[in-house]
Amino acid sequence: MIKTIIFDLGGVLLDIDLPYCIQRVKELGVDIDALSAIPAPELAIDTKPAVMGEGMVASGMLHLYQVGGISTADFIKTIQRLCRPGISYEQVLEAWNTCCIDIPQRRLDNVLALRQRGYRIYMLSNTNDAHWQDIKNRCFGGQDMVDKYFDNVFLSQEMQLAKPNDDIFLKVIEFLSVQPEECLFIDDSTANVEAASYLGFHTIHADVSTTKNGKVIALPNVDWMDEIEEILTQNATSQS
């Protein structure tokens, strides 16, 4: 019986615009290929590239930041060194955070409604400290509001692992003391959904993006509740 529902953040709850973020960073004079090519030091952390969004992965220094291997200050300063002269730390940080748009309230209302029905609700996200601080404070209004919606939050930067690495899913279910078949996982990445499904999770691929002015963004009026309710109903029926 499904008792636990695990949501991805970006592209599922949070509307994101990675192409716009890349554009803004380029406007600072950064060669994106050069940034992506910066190698990461050898550390005892996950080395499998993290999925940032459908079709986009973080490698090298970008991946290192996603899994908490480098501080925000060091990461932003690394980008700043690639900018044209005169670009400030604050300008780089602002450009980096432009991929995080907003979380429509209806999605949060639905998350809360599921929690009030007795489901344990969690977030599992490939994210970094700068993005999480921005999202937590601007979209949620602080940690207390995050706690209102979720029983716990699992972040790649804190776990030093990233989806689709099997180990991050295994660590989550070990921490929660649940079996994969008791969990429903919702993510916008094919690779992440396939990894979870292979381990036995019930899954939903939240693949409802659209292109607007050359940018791929999640539709703000979509919340995947029909798909969630269908799987929950089917699962309950099969267990009765």
What are these regions (language model features)?
Residues 1-7, 128-129, 134-240:
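Asp-based, Mg2+/Mn2+-dependent phosphohydrolase catalytic module
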Residues 1-52, 198-199, 209:
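Active-site neighborhood of HAD-like aspartate-dependent phosphohydrolases
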Residues 8-11, 68, 114, 123, ...:
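Generic structural signal for small/hydrophobic residues in well-ordered secondary structure
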Residues 22, 108-112, 123, 169, ...:
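Short amphipathic alpha-helical segments and helix-helix/interface helices
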Residues 24-25, 38-40, 45, 60-64, ...:
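Helical cap/lid subdomains and adjacent loops of hydrolase enzymes that gate the active-site channel
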Residues 30, 85, 177-178:
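Helix N-cap/coil-helix junction residues
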Residues 50-93:
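A metal-dependent, Asp-based hydrolase signature
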Residues 89-139:
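Substrate-recognition element of Asp-dependent hydrolases with the DxDx(T/V) motif
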